[in-house]
Amino acid sequence: MASGVGAACEELPPDGTCDECEPDEAPGAEEVCRDCGFCYCRRHADAHRQKFLSHRLAAYVHGAQAWTPPASGDDALPEDVEAKGEAEGEVESEVGEEESESEVDSESEEESETEEDSEDESDEESEEDSEEEMEDEQESEAEEDNQEGESEAEGETEAESEFDPEIEMEAERVAKRKCPDHGLDLSTYCQEDRQLICVLCPVIGAHRGHQLSTLDEAFEELRSKDSGGLKAAMIELVERLKFKSSDPKVTRDQMKVFIQQEFKKVQKVIADEEQKALHLVDIQEAMATAHVTEILADIQSHMDRLMTQMAQAKEQLDTSNESAEPKAEGDEEGPSGASEEEDT
């Protein structure tokens, strides 16, 4: 295997193997460098060409003079010059491609980094926006819940006051106990109009000159009336229907008209009985109200008497205290005056 350049190469001619490979494993040479005189296999020839761009490589011919060192750069063969130019162009193109690829890679990396940074920033901004939106939503939900709770409480209060049947019934009972014209308690009964009135209605109201009665009298009169009118009307209705239905001359239409007329009579009797029962209830309620009013009036008068007695007792106590004070002062002066006289 040859080594060295110039004259050294003349003393040690090439042995036909690659000078870069190991001697025991060196394959046959395929190219030879005209500048340094070394022989190379295909792989090391490519590596040598890329490393030394100015060196000229040619095909190695086994059994012949592989190369002769050139006298000067001008004596270089045109083929070698062209091969050198082509090699340099290929190397430059490869280097340019590598540089362009590296530039493209760097640009793509920068763009990807920029995109990642922008994505991170956008993610952070979106997270902040989402947190703010969540806080705003929570605040708005809390306000809505408070407003709903207040509105529900108000609605429940209004509903209780508006739709409570007990309150409505009590209001109706209170309104029924008062005269709609004068606002006084219903304490008298008008026999002509069959209506409860106050004490001012027969004096300055619409019941002047009417026959009146007390609540107790009206209640006893209504209760003592015979309530068998409804029963008698029903028995009479049944008998008349039997008699009418047994008449063969009565048509179906006539029977329908007859039934309607008879039931209207019974309905009138039922309405009278209903009105009577309602009057009894109203009179009882008015009597109870009057009784309670009397009891309250008695209690109030009793309390007034007690208050008067307490005031009188307090005045007497104050008077006795005032009369006792001068006497006590005189008793205190008495012993002191007596002692002074004894000293004199």
Swiss-Prot record:
It comes from Rattus norvegicus. GO terms for cellular component: cytoplasm. Residues 88-165, 330-344 have a biased composition (Acidic residues). Residues 290-325 form a coiled coil. This is Tripartite motif-containing protein 44. The modification Phosphoserine is found at S336, S339. Zn(2+) binds at C179, H182, C201, H207. A zinc finger (B box-type) spans 174-215. Keywords: Coiled coil, Metal-binding, Phosphoprotein, Zinc, Zinc-finger.
